[in-house]
Protein backbone atom coordinates (compact mmCIF):
# COMPACT_ATOMS: atom_id res chain seq x y z
CA UNK A 1 0.00 0.00 0.00
CA UNK A 2 1.24 3.48 -0.84
CA UNK A 3 2.14 5.47 2.27
CA UNK A 4 -0.52 7.97 3.30
CA UNK A 5 0.26 11.09 5.32
CA UNK A 6 -1.48 12.69 8.29
CA UNK A 7 -0.37 16.24 9.11
CA UNK A 8 -1.04 17.58 12.61
CA UNK A 9 -0.89 21.30 13.37
CA UNK A 10 -1.71 23.29 16.49
CA UNK A 11 -3.43 26.61 17.07
CA UNK A 12 -4.18 29.29 19.67
CA UNK A 13 -1.32 28.40 22.02
CA UNK A 14 1.46 25.88 22.56
CA UNK A 15 1.57 22.81 24.83
CA UNK A 16 -1.92 21.66 23.86
CA UNK A 17 -0.75 18.08 23.35
CA UNK A 18 -0.04 17.67 19.63
CA UNK A 19 2.61 15.08 20.43
CA UNK A 20 0.31 12.99 22.59
CA UNK A 21 -2.48 13.33 20.04
CA UNK A 22 -0.16 12.17 17.25
CA UNK A 23 1.08 9.27 19.39
CA UNK A 24 -2.47 8.24 20.31
CA UNK A 25 -3.63 8.34 16.70
CA UNK A 26 -0.60 6.25 15.82
CA UNK A 27 -1.49 3.75 18.54
CA UNK A 28 -5.08 3.49 17.27
CA UNK A 29 -4.00 2.87 13.68
CA UNK A 30 -1.38 0.37 14.85
CA UNK A 31 -4.12 -1.46 16.77
CA UNK A 32 -5.89 -1.85 13.41
CA UNK A 33 -2.90 -3.72 12.02
CA UNK A 34 -1.28 -0.85 10.14
CA UNK A 35 2.41 0.02 10.11
CA UNK A 36 2.79 3.56 11.44
CA UNK A 37 5.68 5.99 11.80
CA UNK A 38 5.67 9.53 13.20
CA UNK A 39 7.88 12.54 12.53
CA UNK A 40 8.28 15.79 14.47
CA UNK A 41 9.32 18.95 12.59
CA UNK A 42 10.48 21.76 14.88
CA UNK A 43 10.67 25.32 13.52
CA UNK A 44 13.55 26.51 15.71
CA UNK A 45 16.94 27.30 14.17
CA UNK A 46 18.99 24.95 16.37
CA UNK A 47 20.31 21.93 14.46
CA UNK A 48 18.87 19.80 17.27
CA UNK A 49 17.85 20.39 20.91
CA UNK A 50 21.08 18.92 22.28
CA UNK A 51 22.51 22.19 23.59
CA UNK A 52 19.22 23.81 24.64
CA UNK A 53 18.40 24.64 28.26
CA UNK A 54 15.89 22.10 29.66
CA UNK A 55 13.86 24.99 31.08
CA UNK A 56 13.31 26.23 27.51
CA UNK A 57 12.90 22.95 25.69
CA UNK A 58 12.26 20.24 28.24
CA UNK A 59 13.87 16.84 27.97
CA UNK A 60 16.30 15.96 25.19
CA UNK A 61 15.31 12.51 23.97
CA UNK A 62 17.91 10.13 22.52
CA UNK A 63 17.24 7.49 19.85
CA UNK A 64 19.09 4.23 19.24
CA UNK A 65 21.06 5.76 16.37
CA UNK A 66 22.22 8.71 18.47
CA UNK A 67 19.82 11.50 17.53
CA UNK A 68 19.24 14.17 20.17
CA UNK A 69 15.57 14.79 19.62
CA UNK A 70 12.39 16.44 20.85
CA UNK A 71 10.68 14.84 23.86
CA UNK A 72 7.65 14.06 21.69
CA UNK A 73 9.68 11.23 20.14
CA UNK A 74 9.47 9.62 23.56
CA UNK A 75 5.68 9.74 23.37
CA UNK A 76 5.80 8.31 19.84
CA UNK A 77 8.02 5.38 20.85
CA UNK A 78 6.09 4.61 24.03
CA UNK A 79 2.69 4.63 22.31
CA UNK A 80 3.82 2.79 19.16
CA UNK A 81 6.05 0.39 21.08
CA UNK A 82 8.84 0.73 18.54
CA UNK A 83 12.21 2.46 18.08
CA UNK A 84 12.51 5.57 15.93
CA UNK A 85 15.58 7.22 14.40
CA UNK A 86 17.15 10.49 13.29
CA UNK A 87 14.70 10.56 10.36
CA UNK A 88 11.83 11.06 12.79
CA UNK A 89 12.89 14.53 13.97
CA UNK A 90 14.18 17.56 12.10
CA UNK A 91 14.40 21.31 12.64
CA UNK A 92 14.58 24.52 10.66
CA UNK A 93 18.26 24.64 11.54
CA UNK A 94 18.90 21.19 10.08
CA UNK A 95 16.87 21.99 6.95
CA UNK A 96 18.65 25.29 6.33
CA UNK A 97 22.02 23.67 7.02
CA UNK A 98 21.39 21.07 4.30
CA UNK A 99 20.28 23.71 1.79
CA UNK A 100 23.23 26.01 2.49
CA UNK A 101 25.64 23.06 2.22
CA UNK A 102 24.16 22.18 -1.17
CA UNK A 103 24.49 25.78 -2.31
CA UNK A 104 28.17 25.83 -1.30
CA UNK A 105 28.78 22.62 -3.27
CA UNK A 106 27.12 24.16 -6.32
CA UNK A 107 24.21 21.72 -6.36
CA UNK A 108 21.75 24.44 -7.39
CA UNK A 109 23.71 25.34 -10.54
CA UNK A 110 23.83 29.08 -9.92
CA UNK A 111 20.16 29.51 -8.98
CA UNK A 112 19.04 32.10 -6.46
CA UNK A 113 18.39 30.00 -3.36
CA UNK A 114 15.05 30.93 -1.79
CA UNK A 115 12.60 29.70 0.83
CA UNK A 116 10.34 28.63 -2.02
CA UNK A 117 11.23 26.28 -3.65
CA UNK A 118 14.56 25.29 -2.06
CA UNK A 119 13.71 25.26 1.66
CA UNK A 120 10.22 23.88 1.07
CA UNK A 121 11.59 21.19 -1.27
CA UNK A 122 14.08 20.12 1.41
CA UNK A 123 11.26 19.92 3.96
CA UNK A 124 9.20 17.81 1.55
CA UNK A 125 12.19 15.55 0.95
CA UNK A 126 12.61 15.11 4.70
CA UNK A 127 8.94 14.17 5.07
CA UNK A 128 8.90 11.83 2.07
CA UNK A 129 12.01 10.02 3.30
CA UNK A 130 9.76 8.43 5.93
CA UNK A 131 7.84 6.62 3.20
CA UNK A 132 11.10 4.98 2.12
CA UNK A 133 12.16 3.92 5.61
CA UNK A 134 11.62 0.39 6.85
CA UNK A 135 9.77 -0.51 10.05
CA UNK A 136 10.29 -4.18 10.90
CA UNK A 137 11.04 -4.73 7.19
CA UNK A 138 7.76 -3.07 6.18
CA UNK A 139 7.17 0.23 4.40
CA UNK A 140 4.92 2.37 6.62
CA UNK A 141 1.25 2.45 5.71
CA UNK A 142 0.82 5.74 7.57
CA UNK A 143 3.27 8.57 8.23
CA UNK A 144 2.08 11.06 10.84
CA UNK A 145 3.81 14.45 10.65
CA UNK A 146 3.58 16.80 13.62
CA UNK A 147 4.44 20.44 12.89
CA UNK A 148 5.87 22.07 16.01
CA UNK A 149 4.86 25.51 17.21
CA UNK A 150 1.59 27.34 16.71
CA UNK A 151 -0.21 28.56 13.60
CA UNK A 152 0.80 32.19 13.14
CA UNK A 153 4.44 31.72 14.18
CA UNK A 154 6.63 33.21 11.46
CA UNK A 155 9.27 30.47 11.70
CA UNK A 156 6.68 27.78 10.95
CA UNK A 157 5.55 29.21 7.61
CA UNK A 158 7.96 27.21 5.38
CA UNK A 159 6.76 23.95 6.96
CA UNK A 160 3.11 24.84 6.42
CA UNK A 161 3.81 25.78 2.81
CA UNK A 162 5.61 22.46 2.30
CA UNK A 163 2.73 20.35 3.65
CA UNK A 164 0.30 22.44 1.59
CA UNK A 165 2.25 21.56 -1.56
CA UNK A 166 2.37 17.87 -0.64
CA UNK A 167 -1.38 17.55 -1.02
CA UNK A 168 -1.00 18.54 -4.68
CA UNK A 169 2.07 16.34 -5.12
CA UNK A 170 0.60 13.22 -3.52
CA UNK A 171 -3.12 13.63 -4.17
CA UNK A 172 -5.88 14.65 -1.80
CA UNK A 173 -6.79 11.03 -1.13
CA UNK A 174 -3.34 10.47 0.38
CA UNK A 175 -3.17 13.48 2.73
CA UNK A 176 -5.18 14.33 5.83
CA UNK A 177 -4.91 17.55 7.86
CA UNK A 178 -5.75 17.50 11.57
CA UNK A 179 -5.79 20.77 13.52
CA UNK A 180 -5.57 20.73 17.32
CA UNK A 181 -6.95 23.89 18.87
CA UNK A 182 -8.12 25.26 22.21
CA UNK A 183 -11.81 25.55 23.04
CA UNK A 184 -11.83 27.22 26.48
CA UNK A 185 -14.70 26.81 28.91
CA UNK A 186 -15.75 29.98 30.74
CA UNK A 187 -17.31 29.11 34.06
CA UNK A 188 -18.86 32.56 34.48
CA UNK A 189 -20.65 32.23 31.14
CA UNK A 190 -21.27 28.51 31.52
CA UNK A 191 -20.23 27.69 27.96
CA UNK A 192 -17.39 26.75 25.64
CA UNK A 193 -16.03 29.58 23.49
CA UNK A 194 -15.27 28.82 19.84
CA UNK A 195 -13.83 32.14 18.69
CA UNK A 196 -10.14 31.18 19.28
CA UNK A 197 -10.68 28.08 17.17
CA UNK A 198 -12.40 30.04 14.41
CA UNK A 199 -9.50 32.50 14.19
CA UNK A 200 -6.91 29.73 14.28
CA UNK A 201 -8.57 27.87 11.41
CA UNK A 202 -8.96 31.14 9.51
CA UNK A 203 -5.20 31.69 9.84
CA UNK A 204 -4.52 28.16 8.62
CA UNK A 205 -6.86 28.53 5.65
CA UNK A 206 -5.18 31.80 4.67
CA UNK A 207 -2.01 29.77 4.13
CA UNK A 208 -3.92 27.40 1.86
CA UNK A 209 -4.61 24.51 4.23
CA UNK A 210 -8.17 23.42 4.96
CA UNK A 211 -8.23 21.09 7.97
CA UNK A 212 -10.20 17.88 7.49
CA UNK A 213 -10.49 17.14 11.20
CA UNK A 214 -10.51 19.48 14.20
CA UNK A 215 -9.46 18.25 17.64
CA UNK A 216 -10.84 20.51 20.35
CA UNK A 217 -8.63 20.69 23.42
CA UNK A 218 -10.92 21.41 26.37
CA UNK A 219 -11.46 20.93 30.09
CA UNK A 220 -14.61 18.88 29.56
CA UNK A 221 -16.16 17.26 26.45
CA UNK A 222 -17.81 19.80 24.18
CA UNK A 223 -21.56 19.41 23.47
CA UNK A 224 -23.02 18.74 20.02
CA UNK A 225 -24.23 22.31 19.52
CA UNK A 226 -20.68 23.63 19.96
CA UNK A 227 -19.39 21.01 17.52
CA UNK A 228 -22.03 22.15 15.03
CA UNK A 229 -20.93 25.77 15.45
CA UNK A 230 -17.28 24.89 14.85
CA UNK A 231 -18.31 22.81 11.85
CA UNK A 232 -20.22 25.74 10.36
CA UNK A 233 -17.60 28.44 10.85
CA UNK A 234 -14.56 26.28 10.08
CA UNK A 235 -16.02 24.46 7.07
CA UNK A 236 -15.49 20.91 8.33
CA UNK A 237 -18.01 18.09 8.63
CA UNK A 238 -19.78 17.97 11.98
CA UNK A 239 -18.63 14.40 12.60
CA UNK A 240 -15.04 15.58 12.00
CA UNK A 241 -15.05 17.78 15.12
CA UNK A 242 -13.76 15.84 18.14
CA UNK A 243 -13.26 16.54 21.82
CA UNK A 244 -9.81 16.18 23.35
CA UNK A 245 -10.82 16.74 26.95
CA UNK A 246 -8.65 16.56 30.07
CA UNK A 247 -7.96 13.00 31.27
CA UNK A 248 -6.54 11.41 34.42
CA UNK A 249 -3.58 9.75 32.71
CA UNK A 250 -2.17 10.01 29.21
CA UNK A 251 -2.61 6.30 28.44
CA UNK A 252 -6.38 6.77 28.40
CA UNK A 253 -6.14 8.99 25.32
CA UNK A 254 -6.20 6.26 22.63
CA UNK A 255 -9.32 4.83 24.27
CA UNK A 256 -10.98 8.25 24.45
CA UNK A 257 -10.24 8.93 20.77
CA UNK A 258 -11.59 5.49 19.89
CA UNK A 259 -14.82 6.17 21.80
CA UNK A 260 -15.17 9.46 19.89
CA UNK A 261 -14.72 7.59 16.59
CA UNK A 262 -11.56 9.44 15.52
CA UNK A 263 -9.82 6.41 14.04
CA UNK A 264 -12.94 5.48 12.07
CA UNK A 265 -13.08 8.98 10.56
CA UNK A 266 -9.39 8.83 9.61
CA UNK A 267 -9.65 5.41 7.96
CA UNK A 268 -12.77 6.47 6.10
CA UNK A 269 -11.19 9.67 4.77
CA UNK A 270 -7.97 7.97 3.65
CA UNK A 271 -9.80 4.87 2.38
CA UNK A 272 -7.79 2.60 4.67
CA UNK A 273 -8.60 -1.04 5.49
CA UNK A 274 -11.33 -1.15 8.14
CA UNK A 275 -9.89 -3.91 10.33
CA UNK A 276 -11.33 -3.78 13.85
CA UNK A 277 -9.07 -2.12 16.42
CA UNK A 278 -7.61 -4.40 19.09
CA UNK A 279 -7.47 -2.16 22.16
CA UNK A 280 -7.52 -4.87 24.81
CA UNK A 281 -3.86 -4.22 25.82
CA UNK A 282 -4.68 -0.53 26.33
CA UNK A 283 -7.81 -1.37 28.32
CA UNK A 284 -5.82 -3.71 30.57
CA UNK A 285 -3.12 -1.06 31.00
CA UNK A 286 -5.57 1.65 32.04
CA UNK A 287 -7.37 -0.78 34.36
CA UNK A 288 -4.07 -1.55 36.12
CA UNK A 289 -3.28 2.15 36.50
CA UNK A 290 -6.74 2.98 37.83
CA UNK A 291 -6.86 0.07 40.30
CA UNK A 292 -3.51 0.00 42.12
CA UNK A 293 -2.82 -2.40 44.98
CA UNK A 294 -0.57 -0.01 46.85
CA UNK A 295 1.61 3.09 46.68
CA UNK A 296 5.27 4.00 47.04
CA UNK A 297 6.90 7.41 47.26
CA UNK A 298 9.95 8.16 45.12
CA UNK A 299 11.94 11.38 45.45
CA UNK A 300 13.72 12.70 42.35
CA UNK A 301 16.66 14.91 43.29
CA UNK A 302 17.46 17.18 40.34
CA UNK A 303 18.33 20.68 39.22
CA UNK A 304 15.54 21.21 36.66
CA UNK A 305 12.63 20.39 38.96
CA UNK A 306 10.91 23.70 38.18
CA UNK A 307 9.90 22.14 34.84
CA UNK A 308 9.03 18.48 35.17
CA UNK A 309 9.00 18.20 31.34
CA UNK A 310 12.80 18.14 31.71
CA UNK A 311 12.38 14.64 33.18
CA UNK A 312 9.46 13.46 31.03
CA UNK A 313 10.75 10.02 30.06
CA UNK A 314 12.00 9.46 33.60
CA UNK A 315 8.57 10.28 34.98
CA UNK A 316 6.92 7.85 32.58
CA UNK A 317 9.47 5.08 33.19
CA UNK A 318 8.86 5.27 36.95
CA UNK A 319 5.13 5.05 36.28
CA UNK A 320 5.82 2.00 34.08
CA UNK A 321 7.69 0.46 37.02
CA UNK A 322 4.59 1.06 39.10
CA UNK A 323 2.39 -0.57 36.45
CA UNK A 324 4.63 -3.65 36.44
CA UNK A 325 4.23 -3.90 40.23
CA UNK A 326 0.52 -2.94 40.12
CA UNK A 327 1.01 0.08 42.37
CA UNK A 328 0.89 3.87 42.17
CA UNK A 329 4.19 5.73 42.20
CA UNK A 330 3.96 9.07 44.00
CA UNK A 331 6.74 11.26 42.59
CA UNK A 332 8.24 14.09 44.61
CA UNK A 333 10.69 16.47 42.94
CA UNK A 334 13.32 18.16 45.14
CA UNK A 335 15.79 20.83 44.04
CA UNK A 336 19.25 19.50 44.88
CA UNK A 337 20.47 23.01 45.69
CA UNK A 338 18.44 23.14 48.90
CA UNK A 339 19.64 19.80 50.31
CA UNK A 340 22.17 19.90 53.15
CA UNK A 341 23.28 17.58 55.93
CA UNK A 342 21.07 19.57 58.30
CA UNK A 343 17.76 19.10 56.44
CA UNK A 344 18.25 15.77 54.66
CA UNK A 345 16.32 13.80 57.31
CA UNK A 346 13.29 16.03 56.96
CA UNK A 347 13.39 16.09 53.15
CA UNK A 348 13.49 12.30 52.80
CA UNK A 349 11.14 11.47 55.65
CA UNK A 350 8.83 8.65 54.56
CA UNK A 351 10.31 8.09 51.09
CA UNK A 352 10.65 4.59 49.67
CA UNK A 353 13.28 5.35 47.04
CA UNK A 354 15.65 8.10 45.93
CA UNK A 355 16.59 8.75 42.31
CA UNK A 356 19.25 11.15 41.03
CA UNK A 357 18.82 11.71 37.26
CA UNK A 358 21.14 12.97 34.54
CA UNK A 359 22.21 16.57 34.08
CA UNK A 360 25.15 18.84 33.42
CA UNK A 361 27.25 21.32 35.38
CA UNK A 362 28.28 21.76 39.01
CA UNK A 363 25.19 23.57 40.30
CA UNK A 364 23.45 21.53 42.99
CA UNK A 365 26.01 18.71 42.92
CA UNK A 366 26.76 18.70 46.65
CA UNK A 367 23.04 18.32 47.40
CA UNK A 368 22.90 15.28 45.13
CA UNK A 369 25.94 13.76 46.82
CA UNK A 370 24.39 14.35 50.25
CA UNK A 371 21.18 12.64 49.07
CA UNK A 372 23.17 9.62 47.90
CA UNK A 373 25.02 9.41 51.22
CA UNK A 374 21.68 9.38 53.01
CA UNK A 375 20.28 6.63 50.76
CA UNK A 376 23.40 4.52 51.20
CA UNK A 377 23.57 4.83 54.98
CA UNK A 378 19.82 4.46 55.58
CA UNK A 379 19.46 1.47 53.21
CA UNK A 380 16.90 3.31 51.07
CA UNK A 381 16.66 2.00 47.48
CA UNK A 382 18.77 4.28 45.28
CA UNK A 383 18.89 4.68 41.51
CA UNK A 384 21.49 6.95 39.87
CA UNK A 385 21.28 7.67 36.15
CA UNK A 386 24.16 9.16 34.10
CA UNK A 387 25.26 12.12 36.26
CA UNK A 388 23.45 10.37 39.12
CA UNK A 389 25.82 7.42 38.79
CA UNK A 390 28.81 9.75 38.64
CA UNK A 391 27.67 11.48 41.83
CA UNK A 392 27.31 8.06 43.48
CA UNK A 393 30.90 7.31 42.53
CA UNK A 394 32.09 10.59 44.05
CA UNK A 395 30.10 10.01 47.26
CA UNK A 396 31.51 6.49 47.60
CA UNK A 397 35.04 7.73 46.98
CA UNK A 398 34.81 10.45 49.62
CA UNK A 399 32.89 8.65 52.35
CA UNK A 400 33.77 4.97 51.90
CA UNK A 401 37.05 4.73 49.99
CA UNK A 402 38.63 7.59 51.94
CA UNK A 403 39.43 9.76 48.91
CA UNK A 404 38.38 13.05 50.50
CA UNK A 405 39.08 15.27 47.48
CA UNK A 406 37.42 13.01 44.93
CA UNK A 407 35.57 14.91 42.21
CA UNK A 408 34.62 14.94 38.55
CA UNK A 409 36.74 16.62 35.92
CA UNK A 410 33.52 18.31 34.81
CA UNK A 411 33.16 20.12 38.14
CA UNK A 412 36.85 20.68 38.92
CA UNK A 413 39.29 20.21 36.02
CA UNK A 414 42.29 20.43 38.38
CA UNK A 415 40.96 18.12 41.10
CA UNK A 416 43.59 15.91 42.73
CA UNK A 417 41.45 12.78 42.39
CA UNK A 418 39.30 12.81 39.27
CA UNK A 419 37.26 9.65 39.81
CA UNK A 420 35.12 10.80 36.86
CA UNK A 421 37.01 12.06 33.83
CA UNK A 422 36.51 13.27 30.26
CA UNK A 423 36.43 10.44 27.74
CA UNK A 424 39.07 11.01 25.08
CA UNK A 425 38.11 8.11 22.84
CA UNK A 426 35.64 5.25 22.49
CA UNK A 427 34.59 2.66 19.92
CA UNK A 428 31.48 3.47 17.88
CA UNK A 429 30.22 0.03 16.85
CA UNK A 430 27.54 1.50 14.56
CA UNK A 431 30.16 3.09 12.31
CA UNK A 432 33.00 0.68 13.17
CA UNK A 433 35.25 3.60 14.10
CA UNK A 434 37.09 5.12 17.04
CA UNK A 435 35.64 8.46 18.19
CA UNK A 436 38.10 11.05 19.52
CA UNK A 437 37.24 14.03 21.74
CA UNK A 438 38.93 16.70 23.83
CA UNK A 439 37.92 19.75 25.86
CA UNK A 440 38.09 21.99 22.77
CA UNK A 441 35.45 20.10 20.77
CA UNK A 442 32.12 21.67 19.83
CA UNK A 443 29.37 21.11 22.38
CA UNK A 444 26.63 20.02 19.98
CA UNK A 445 26.48 16.40 18.82
CA UNK A 446 29.86 15.41 20.28
CA UNK A 447 28.87 13.24 23.24
CA UNK A 448 28.75 9.46 23.33
CA UNK A 449 25.25 9.21 21.91
CA UNK A 450 22.83 6.42 21.14
CA UNK A 451 22.69 2.70 21.80
CA UNK A 452 25.80 0.80 22.93
CA UNK A 453 26.22 -2.81 24.09
CA UNK A 454 26.87 -3.69 27.71
CA UNK A 455 27.98 -6.96 29.31
CA UNK A 456 26.56 -7.88 32.72
CA UNK A 457 28.15 -9.96 35.47
CA UNK A 458 26.06 -12.85 36.71
CA UNK A 459 24.76 -12.98 40.28
CA UNK A 460 24.42 -9.21 40.48
CA UNK A 461 21.32 -7.09 40.98
CA UNK A 462 21.64 -5.80 37.41
CA UNK A 463 21.75 -9.34 36.01
CA UNK A 464 18.79 -10.32 38.19
CA UNK A 465 16.78 -7.40 36.78
CA UNK A 466 17.63 -8.02 33.12
CA UNK A 467 17.82 -11.84 33.23
CA UNK A 468 20.52 -11.77 30.56
CA UNK A 469 24.24 -11.02 30.39
CA UNK A 470 24.12 -8.89 27.22
CA UNK A 471 22.08 -5.70 26.80
CA UNK A 472 22.01 -2.51 24.73
CA UNK A 473 21.16 0.87 26.24
CA UNK A 474 21.09 4.50 25.10
CA UNK A 475 23.77 6.94 26.20
CA UNK A 476 24.25 10.71 26.35
CA UNK A 477 27.44 11.64 28.16
CA UNK A 478 31.03 12.78 27.74
CA UNK A 479 32.38 11.88 31.20
CA UNK A 480 33.08 8.37 32.47
CA UNK A 481 34.35 6.42 35.49
CA UNK A 482 38.15 6.61 35.84
CA UNK A 483 39.42 3.03 35.65
CA UNK A 484 42.52 3.62 37.77
CA UNK A 485 40.22 3.58 40.82
CA UNK A 486 38.47 0.29 39.99
CA UNK A 487 40.47 -1.99 42.27
CA UNK A 488 40.38 0.46 45.16
CA UNK A 489 36.60 0.78 44.92
CA UNK A 490 36.08 -2.97 44.55
CA UNK A 491 38.00 -3.59 47.77
CA UNK A 492 35.52 -1.32 49.58
CA UNK A 493 32.40 -3.06 48.28
CA UNK A 494 31.52 -1.49 44.93
CA UNK A 495 30.58 -3.93 42.18
CA UNK A 496 31.07 -3.04 38.52
CA UNK A 497 28.19 -5.17 37.32
CA UNK A 498 28.01 -3.80 33.78
CA UNK A 499 30.79 -2.77 31.40
CA UNK A 500 31.37 -2.26 27.70
CA UNK A 501 32.12 -5.59 25.97
CA UNK A 502 35.85 -4.78 25.94
CA UNK A 503 35.70 -3.97 29.69
CA UNK A 504 37.10 -0.46 29.17
CA UNK A 505 34.01 1.55 30.17
CA UNK A 506 32.02 1.16 33.38
CA UNK A 507 28.30 1.12 32.60
CA UNK A 508 26.67 -0.08 35.86
CA UNK A 509 27.75 0.08 39.50
CA UNK A 510 26.08 -1.37 42.57
CA UNK A 511 26.91 -1.83 46.24
CA UNK A 512 27.49 -5.17 47.86
CA UNK A 513 25.85 -4.59 51.25
CA UNK A 514 22.76 -2.59 50.32
CA UNK A 515 19.16 -3.71 49.56
CA UNK A 516 19.13 -1.92 46.17
CA UNK A 517 21.77 0.61 45.13
CA UNK A 518 22.40 0.86 41.40
CA UNK A 519 23.93 3.53 39.19
CA UNK A 520 24.06 3.34 35.41
CA UNK A 521 25.91 5.54 32.94
CA UNK A 522 23.19 5.12 30.30
CA UNK A 523 19.58 6.36 30.22
CA UNK A 524 17.25 3.37 30.72
CA UNK A 525 14.21 5.66 30.75
CA UNK A 526 14.52 5.97 26.96
CA UNK A 527 13.78 2.26 26.50
CA UNK A 528 10.81 1.89 28.83
CA UNK A 529 7.31 1.33 27.45
CA UNK A 530 3.92 1.14 29.20
CA UNK A 531 3.37 -2.34 27.75
CA UNK A 532 6.98 -3.35 28.48
CA UNK A 533 8.44 -1.54 31.51
CA UNK A 534 12.23 -1.32 31.67
CA UNK A 535 13.79 -4.03 33.89
CA UNK A 536 15.71 -1.58 36.07
CA UNK A 537 12.67 0.60 36.79
CA UNK A 538 10.56 -2.48 37.43
CA UNK A 539 13.14 -3.78 39.90
CA UNK A 540 13.73 -0.37 41.52
CA UNK A 541 10.02 0.06 42.25
CA UNK A 542 9.87 -3.52 43.52
CA UNK A 543 12.68 -2.67 45.95
CA UNK A 544 10.78 0.48 46.97
CA UNK A 545 7.72 -1.71 47.67
CA UNK A 546 9.80 -3.92 49.96
CA UNK A 547 11.12 -0.84 51.76
CA UNK A 548 7.57 0.46 52.14
CA UNK A 549 6.51 -2.76 53.89
CA UNK A 550 9.24 -2.50 56.54
From Swiss-Prot:
Species annotation: Lawsonia intracellularis (strain PHE/MN1-00)
Active site residues per record: 386 (nucleophile), 523, 525
Misc: CTPSs have evolved a hybrid strategy for distinguishing between UTP and CTP. The overlapping regions of the product feedback inhibitory and substrate sites recognize a common feature in both compounds, the triphosphate moiety. To differentiate isosteric substrate and product pyrimidine rings, an additional pocket far from the expected kinase/ligase catalytic site, specifically recognizes the cytosine and ribose portions of the product inhibitor.
UniProt keyword list: ATP-binding, Glutamine amidotransferase, Ligase, Magnesium, Metal-binding, Nucleotide-binding, Pyrimidine biosynthesis
Annotated Mg(2+) binding sites: 72, 146
Gene3D superfamilies (alphabetical): 3.40.50.880, P-loop containing nucleotide triphosphate hydrolases
Family: Belongs to the CTP synthase family.
Regulation of its activity: Allosterically activated by GTP, when glutamine is the substrate; GTP has no effect on the reaction when ammonia is the substrate. The allosteric effector GTP functions by stabilizing the protein conformation that binds the tetrahedral intermediate(s) formed during glutamine hydrolysis. Inhibited by the product CTP, via allosteric rather than competitive inhibition.
Pfam family, one: CTP_synth_N
Protein residues bound to L-glutamine: 55, 359, 387-390, 410, 478
Gene designation per UniProt: pyrG
Record EC number: 6.3.4.2
Quaternary structure annotation from Swiss-Prot or TrEMBL: Homotetramer.
Chain sites annotated for binding ATP: 15-20, 72
Catalytic activity annotation: UTP + L-glutamine + ATP + H2O = CTP + L-glutamate + ADP + phosphate + 2 H(+); L-glutamine + H2O = L-glutamate + NH4(+); UTP + NH4(+) + ATP = CTP + ADP + phosphate + 2 H(+)
Binding-site positions, CTP: 14, 153-155, 193-198, 229
Task performed by this protein: Catalyzes the ATP-dependent amination of UTP to CTP with either L-glutamine or ammonia as the source of nitrogen. Regulates intracellular CTP levels through interactions with the four ribonucleotide triphosphates.
CDD domains assigned: CTPS_N (cd03113), GATase1_CTP_Synthase (cd01746)
GO-annotated cellular components: cytosol
Region (Amidoligase domain): 1-272
Domain Glutamine amidotransferase type-1: 297-550
GO BP terms: 'de novo' CTP biosynthetic process; pyrimidine nucleobase biosynthetic process
Protein name: CTP synthase
Molecular functions per Gene Ontology: ATP binding; CTP synthase activity; glutaminase activity; identical protein binding; metal ion binding
InterPro entries in alphabetical order: Class_I_gatase-like, CTP_synthase, CTP_synthase_N, GATASE, GATase1_CTP_Synthase, P-loop_NTPase
Residue sites binding UTP per the record: 14, 193-198, 229
Enzyme class: ligase
Pathway: Pyrimidine metabolism; CTP biosynthesis via de novo pathway; CTP from UDP: step 2/2
